[in-house]
Every structure is written in structure tokens, then in C-alpha cells.
Amino acid sequence: GQIDFQAPDEGTGTDAILKSASIQAVSEGDFSSSFNRTSLVLNTARSAAVGSAGDGGKLTLRSNGSMLLKDMRTDANAPSFILQTGNTNVAQDDVLGAIEFQAPDEGTGTDAILVAANISAISEGDFSSSSNATSLVFKTGASETATTKMKLSSGGNLSLPTDSVELAFGNDSDVKLTHVADTGLILAAGGQTTSDFGTP
């Protein structure tokens, strides 16, 4: 089935009276006694009838829960997904937007249903006419609601706030740089310590 949106009586005519948007339920294959997979497709138009090649945008929600966002224009444009806050007075540590990852229906419950990972944009201070300083914060959880493990500041500084954090390099992680709380850094290769950068 399909729902179309149109302004057929628009006085300016031409593009203005064409179908400008649609919602479609589209089969993902031949229906059978064991198959009725269907995608929900939202189409928008810019200067042609909705669904025309090379025009408008398309959002598809598939039966497996995946989502596809496509800019249908052919002139090298790329689609964007924008998270906006309605906050009119952004202060320090306000979350401007976040993406969370969770398995809320996991049968074992407890920790299993908590937010397992999170990517947030968090303000570094009060916004003003000359400042919108924001950090991108990456959170993960092991047996907890996800907590901050890495932060990229507005100035480009990368911080890893967890003690004993380890950076691994190479396909086999054969070179590792490990932080030791209140001590310094240890550089190891092939399981052997090669350098120890202690605090002064």
C-alpha cells in the first residue's frame, strides 16, 4: 500500500502540483505461508514528482530493523542525520545529542538490559555568540550502564580517563602502550617491556 501527499490545487502549477511525498509498504520478496517481510519507505521530493530518479530523499526501514537513508540526487550530495536540542540556554555538561546501544529484551535481565554503549555530544561550557565548544564522548559498559572511556575535546585533545587503559597497535596487537595509575606509561612489544615512561 501507499499514501501520497500532494497539493493539486496550488496555483503556481508545474512542480508545485506534483506528488511531493509518499509512504510505502514494499515487499522484500515473494509472500508465502512463511514470508511476509516488508519495508516501510518514506520518499520526499525537491523539484520533481516523488520517487523520480535523481530527486529528493529516501528513508527505508527494513524488516530486520536496519535503516537506510539516501540522498537521491546524483550531483555528489551526501545524506546527513542531524540531532538537535531545543535547549535555549545551553550550559556546561548539557547533552546536545546522543546515540545509545542497548538490548532491553535480553532475558537474563539486570546488567544485560542496561545501556551498553553510548556516543554523546556534550557542551564544555555555556554557549554564547562566540562559543559552542563541545566534546564527543564515547561510553562503554562491562557490567554497568555505559560510562565514559574516551573523550575528544573541541580543541582536538583525546583523553582516556580510565586507569590502566591500554592502546594496542598492529593486526596482532603486538605493540601495546599501557597506562599505570600515578606511575606513567609502559611500552611493550611481543609481550616484552621495551620502554617505561615514569612520572618525574
Indicate residue ranges for each PLM-predicted region.
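Outer-membrane beta-barrel proteins
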Residues: E28-F31, E124-G125
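Short Gly/Ser/Thr-biased coil->beta-strand turn/linker motifs
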Residues: G1-D9, A16-A25, N36-A45, G51-D105, ...
